[in-house]
Each structure stands twice: as structure tokens, then as C-alpha cells.
UniProtKB/Swiss-Prot annotation:
<keyword id="KW-0460">Magnesium</keyword>
<feature type="binding site">
    <location>
        <position position="427"/>
    </location>
    <ligand>
        <name>Mg(2+) 2</name>
    </ligand>
</feature>
<dbReference type="InterPro" id="IPR018149">
    <property type="entry name" value="Lys-tRNA-synth_II_C"/>
</dbReference>
<keyword id="KW-0963">Cytoplasm</keyword>
<keyword id="KW-0648">Protein biosynthesis</keyword>
<dbReference type="GO" id="GO:0005829">
    <property type="term" value="C:cytosol"/>
</dbReference>
<dbReference type="InterPro" id="IPR012340">
    <property type="entry name" value="NA-bd_OB-fold"/>
</dbReference>
<dbReference type="GO" id="GO:0005524">
    <property type="term" value="F:ATP binding"/>
</dbReference>
<comment type="subunit">
    <text>Homodimer.</text>
</comment>
<dbReference type="Pfam" id="PF01336">
    <property type="entry name" value="tRNA_anti-codon"/>
</dbReference>
<dbReference type="InterPro" id="IPR004365">
    <property type="entry name" value="NA-bd_OB_tRNA"/>
</dbReference>
<dbReference type="InterPro" id="IPR044136">
    <property type="entry name" value="Lys-tRNA-ligase_II_N"/>
</dbReference>
<feature type="binding site">
    <location>
        <position position="420"/>
    </location>
    <ligand>
        <name>Mg(2+) 1</name>
    </ligand>
</feature>
<dbReference type="InterPro" id="IPR002313">
    <property type="entry name" value="Lys-tRNA-ligase_II"/>
</dbReference>
<feature type="binding site">
    <location>
        <position position="427"/>
    </location>
    <ligand>
        <name>Mg(2+) 1</name>
    </ligand>
</feature>
<dbReference type="Pfam" id="PF00152">
    <property type="entry name" value="tRNA-synt_2"/>
</dbReference>
<keyword id="KW-0436">Ligase</keyword>
Amino acid sequence: MGEKQLTKEEIKARKMEAKKEAEFNALVKERMQKLENLQEQGKDPFDVYKVERTHTSQQVKDNYDELEGKNVTVAGRLMSKRVHGKAGFSDIRDRYGKIQLYIKINDVGEEKLKEYKTFDIGDFVSITGTVFKTKTGEITLHILDFQLLSKSLKPLPEKFHGLKDPDLRYRQRYVDLIMNEDVKETFMKRTAIIKAIREFLDNRDFLEVETPILSPIAGGAAARPFITHHNALDIDMYLRIATELYLKRLIVGGFEKVYEIGKNFRNEGIDVRHNPEFTAIELYEAYADYNDMMEITENMVAYVCEKVNGTTKVMYEGTEIDFKPPWRRITMVDAVKEYAGVDFNEVKTDEEAREIAKSKELELKKELKDCTKGDILVALFEEFGEEKLMQPTFVCDYPKENSPLTKKKRGNDELTERFEGFVYGREICNAYSELNDPIVQKERFMQQLKERELGDDEAYMMDDDFINALEIGMPPTGGLGIGIDRLIMFLTDSSSIRDVILFPTMKPTK
């Protein structure tokens, strides 16, 4: 068979692409030639090691009254250049913003002006100049001297078109940060959010700790792990899927309030809410229960939101969300009754629950015959209730089958003292009254091993050392985990988790 004939539009698009590539290559060649010329003149910009700048762009603007008429030195990336004839304007950008530059032949001389004109957008320069305001009131530096610090050998995307392709933005985040100020703002806010979380917990006398990322057992969550091999020990090891079991060991050891902010790794799919490598916080408090964890969650999130946004209210994808405490509390049984129309208080057996699953045509994670009443309760909530929870809501009292590390509900042996927090129909946190009975914990792990044998590769592994720690004795404890990336999505109105992770996981290009 012959090759498929291209349409006129496809031919035109290919020609345009070829033209753009040729233009790009010509610009790269031109910049390489400029670098060679500089090197021949003994002005290699890559031989510059350090710059003594006196001010940032923002400091010049903030202190204009005292700096007017004085000389300062700034440094940054050249973002625009409008120099024609004997004078002109430019802009450079540093971490804090942009500042305008004005150059004139009378101040720098003909040779220096000629050199300045050879600079390209994207080059790094240092500028020494006098601070003044233009007739339009813009704070500007009147250039007296300059130095090329680094040569940009590839042109930046066009100013007005910018870097729009999301895939390319994620792969080349360094270019994305240069071209899109709002992206830089998102990541500045990310840093502020994590700082505020630490501040909140430190003020409550929590101790920040670090636990292993490599472990012989993947525990603390229902997830598929990444596996690696330790050559010296000749054993397979796992990248952690959660920090839970190590942090609880520290509660056993006498650290009564601990937290860890760090990376977890789960060998699962990638979508707008999931990245295989993600940041989470887990915290544990001795002598506390899941009610205390609700109080910490709602107050911490409200504190962080107000700290970085000035209010507990945010707009997320056009919906106003208010994180002000107290958040709504509803049991999973009541949520299923409200949103699925099924009263699980009346469901007595697994078989009755399976009949309900059939009638609702539920999608289940395992075969119907292997599903328990608790499995079906959770599936009904996920199918009918989860996406309805737009405002911050704690869904409480999960079935024990789905919560192997959790204490049973006081007064109900079928349920556990566990909650998950939901916002905009999405889970952002998970918390328990932690199970501290080593005998029951071992039984729960054994049940999870049976689940693994049935094909559930996300079921928990047996952790004998953790059982040993519980046998030494762990006090009643409340525990909480929050997905920091998802929280940041809400506080920055970001629709994809990739928009709040600097370098998200991407499929390699060929």
C-alpha cells in the first residue's frame, strides 16, 4: 500500500513547522557566532564567576525616594531591548520582578553602545546605572556600565505567544518560569504554604522528623510501590508509599507529637490529581483521637489559607470554597443514605449488600462474591457521594475492612474511627484514631495478606517489626495525612497537579 496522502492543511502545517525550525536554527547559529566573537575578543561571558550587585529590582523600586540620583548595580535576564540609533530602553528581570533600563551613547560611548546592541533577549547582564523616573513615571536605571554574564544560545519563545503547550511547559519548566510570571507566583506560593504548615505545627509543639525513603517493606497505605535493589545487601527494597509506620514507631519511642513533610512514591497512573512522586505531610499526636485530628486539620488549613491568601475563602475553578472552621461532619453511612438513597443501618449481611451493588450497577475493585458489606458501602460513597462534597467536609467512620491501621468505632465493631476530608469532590486528607493493639493489628495484617493472595497488589504487607513496636506499647494516638500538592492546587486555583509540581513525571520523548 502507498503512503497516505496529506491534506492541504497538513501540507501547509508541515511547511510552517519547517520554516519555524529553519528560523530557529538560524537564530541559534547567529548567537553561537556572537559567542565566538566575544571569546576571540577575550570577553567570554562564561569566564565571569561572581557579580557584586547592590540591589534587586524590587529594592530599587521600594527605596526609590532615597535612591533617586544615586548609582546602583542590578543583575538579571534581558527580557526586552528597544535600542535604535544613539539611545533606547530595555528591561531585565530578576527573581523579584522587572526593571527598565535606559542607555544613551553620551554616557557609555560608541563602542559600548555597539556592544550592548549585540546582546540578545535571554542573556544575563549586570547593570550599573543612576536611578531616575521617566516622564511616564516609570522607575528606570540610566546605564553607566554593564557586563555580559551569560550568553543565551537558544531564543526564548515569542513574547506574545509565550510558552503555551502544556506538555512542553512541564518538560521545560525553566522556560515556563521565565515566560509566565503567574507560574512563578504559584511556586512562590507553594513555598509559603509549606512554610506556614511548619509554622502552625511548630507553634503547637510538634517535632519535625525524617524517616527512611528506602524500606524493605512498603507500608502505611494501600498502594502499589516502586521496587529497587540494594546491591551491597542484595535485597529488594521499596520507595516509601507513606511515612506512617515509622512515625508511629517514634510515638512508641516517646516522641509525643511528630510530623514529616516529604516525598512519597506510588507506582500508579498519572492524571490531573495523581503524580507518582508527590509531597505529603503526616503527623501523629499521643493521647489524641480522630476528633482532635479534625480540629487540627480544619484549623491548620484555615491558618495556611489566611496566611498566604489573606482570607479563608478561595475561588477554585469558578466555585467559592470557604475553609473557615468548623467544617461539615458526616458519617459515611449517612452520606450514602443522603446521596445514594441506601440506608446501611438496615443492611445486615454481605449478601444483602451485594444485591444492592447489583441493583446500583456498581463498579467494584474485586469480584462481587469477594466483596463485603464494608467494601460495598465505600464503593457506594465513592460512586454517589464523593463528587457532591464541594465545601470542606469530613466523612467519618469507615468500615474496618478498608482501614487496617485504625481503631474500631466506639460502640460499633463494624466501623473504625477514621475520616477523610473532601473539598470540591476530592479527597485531601486521611486520619485515624490509630490502632495500638498489637494482637488486633496482626490479625488485620493477616487479613490484608489474604487480600493480596486474591490479587489485590495494593493490600498491606506484613510488618513484623511494627508489630514488635506495638508490643512494646504505644499510647492512644491520633494520626493525620494530607496531600500537600492537592492542597496547593486549591489555594492557587490550579486545575492539574502538574501545575503545582515543578518537575512532574513525564513520559520520555523519543
